[in-house]
């Protein structure tokens, strides 16, 4: 700790008042921390001006993808995701941390194994990816409770406010998680360059103080006190200016906001609502935070999907490649310097970690699928945009202008937004004025260039903007010292390979394009056809015009080779950095970008490095693929692909070419229906001999829950007793007086929940669920009861996660789970005494490896039978495909072996038949991890991907199912299969399985 001088204390006071330290560099104002102790650490690492961040003194555009490590509980797969994001041209990943998974019991912070952050930091560094850390404490994220642990329902204070009880509840978590993040900061050699306190702190109701500077300052101070010294950034839910620099107490260093402009209506994926394209972001930014780089911390890259929704394939169609072309280029038109796409890889809501508004899959329609595939066209389109930005540092120096329908394009049907450089290059973003238009619009452009104002095309013809498309036309674009006066075709990338320069341009089908280059040399077509191609020299300028074709053309002008491609062809090109060795990939910088090569190779290129006289590529293939290397270093002679020396040819343009043969292995998967299934009745609670004396008594006279007063004599809110996840079971005991004829009960489990009720062994009925219902009131007719006899009501509730808490003051997260009210006809409610259970131990959860949310309250779960090697030898043999003949819950377990060949990434899925018969619910456990909740009558999910590492691809696996029949005729699985999709020949390192502890008898299990 440093003793602060009087001046330093004055600076701290200035910071509290909203001041900042400024100095000038190359005409731009750099902003640094006003705390000199922190500035001493930061000034050479992460600073910023009004244009962009500087990292290690270099101006950098942050192009980032959102990834949640907790949604992929196989740390050895994180590198795969990072490398696929790096291949997009991105340089950063943003991540949330889910508090509920790390502090399942108040005061006990556990971040080990799959939940440890350090391995995430390590692989980010290995992949050359910076990190934006977003640990909350509130994260939203479509996570149960918005990331809040269930025990916060008992906190006597308003959440996300400066209420002392809430602040105290957050202290332990933030102290630990922020300290871990601090160790991973760039100042300590780690990848973390930004930290976000809180999340979408943007609105309030219900008399909550908002914005509450004291609250935000407390969250900021928590982080700083734990060692966070990187700049703090926020994500306002809209352009509200909350907590922007200069707003006073609770202000962040860099203001950012979110935007989901297309909304979440995946049921109508082709509908783009009128007026949803942002047009004022630049103006808003200049009003709210003109001294910081324009930052979009969450911009839409997909959509959530509710229970009963159309499915994530429809969400991927809604936020598709066309969306990316129009909306992301629109973001660039505002001068976005920090752009994070939510989600870039979604993952899975395994182990009950999701909120009630979503199901097991968190695919999100993202560029990377839930199973980590990169087969969606939107991934390829995003790669074009990402690599363009990476190759265009002058973009950050250009000043965004006002959009206009006149002055640049010759038709008002098009809108142009200029980003004008001062001798450093300009960019013109063109879109349809009606952004929803699907028309093909011809146009010409009037462009201000270093050669004067030019109307293009100059050599005849017109340009075309197809429907739901957008283009970035460059002017005075620097390609290693060669000035591209203009190009109407879009830039993918360019490289300087010493003796030659390469520029890759592309256009859409049926388009005509033109470029002008400041060179005196003649034009040569060195590859491809001369047809539909023309050129003309005008003084010291060469003008080239062509029609886009699927066949590649290479045009040479002096030492510049220009590749003219169509969009679908350029999807197969990659720009890996050329690393020094195979141990890690450097962070994106001017140097590493300049050292990159260009590879045409189909599915995926991960890395490239040189060793001795060899060029080594690591790449994945899903088909026999021609491979080309453009710009191989002059000192290498040999080519290795995935470690194998590969013969190649060199053409007249110096391009290496070879072919990688693909022959998919035969993947033999076990038949699920033919496994040796063992069966156990897992609703033993309805048996007349069942003893619940070991169960917790629901005997609280009051509830600490401040949201909803009790409407029962004793609290029946599950979180009051430490049960926050999965299935709940209640047992209500009463002595009949003979007057009881009906039982009315209101249960609450969240959207799409279900419940069933028994009186002794008599099934009374079920609420089978609807997405629209978070709670439901049911009335059941009782069989004849005998006066003086003991009876037990057994109520089973499937909880779907806790509500999020997005609006401050609502305390929605405190919406209880369990029984809200009940009425036994003819009796006072106090005539029933209750017991309840959820997962064994509640907050003293048994399975520290799989975490506090993974298992619920069924008998088999409480015993741990869902784990590998349960004591099933003497259990009955029965199959879930035969199922149950009456209401209840069956537990089925079986083992099987897999022998998936190494060197292949083979996505595996458990598929359920889509039944239209009686309603039932299934939980899928794989090697102890709950990896699926299937609800037959609601859907939409029927296919559940389970990653390698949860599944043992070379070894023994255990699968367990809980089958809950909600209706009187029972239920069975129509079908249940393990299937694979296309095997990918991969360079991915060996996958280490996540820990899968076997069954051990649990002390105190009931």
Swiss-Prot record:
GO terms for biological process: galactose catabolic process; polysaccharide catabolic process. Residues 1-18 form the signal peptide. It catalyses: Hydrolysis of terminal non-reducing beta-D-galactose residues in beta-D-galactosides. InterPro entries: Betagal_dom2, Betagal_dom2_sf, BetaGal_dom3, BetaGal_dom3_sf, BetaGal_jelly_roll_dom, Galactose-bd-like_sf, Gly_Hdrlase_35_cat, Glyco_hydro_35_CS. GO terms for cellular component: extracellular region; vacuole. GO terms for molecular function: beta-galactosidase activity. It is an enzyme of class 3 (hydrolase). PROSITE patterns: GLYCOSYL_HYDROL_F35 (PS01182). Its EC number is 3.2.1.23. Substrate binds at residues 96, 140-142, 199, 260, 364. Keywords: Carbohydrate metabolism, Disulfide bond, Glycoprotein, Glycosidase, Hydrolase, Polysaccharide degradation, Secreted, Signal. The active site is at 200 (proton donor), 298 (nucleophile). It comes from the Eukaryota. Glycans are attached at residues 156, 373, 402, 422, 622, 760, 777, 914. It is found in: Secreted. Pfam families: BetaGal_ABD2, BetaGal_dom2, BetaGal_dom3, Glyco_hydro_35. Disulfide bonds join 205-206, 266-315. Belongs to the glycosyl hydrolase 35 family. Cleaves beta-linked terminal galactosyl residues from gangliosides, glycoproteins, and glycosaminoglycans. This is Probable beta-galactosidase A. It comes from Aspergillus fumigatus (strain ATCC MYA-4609 / CBS 101355 / FGSC A1100 / Af293) (Neosartorya fumigata).
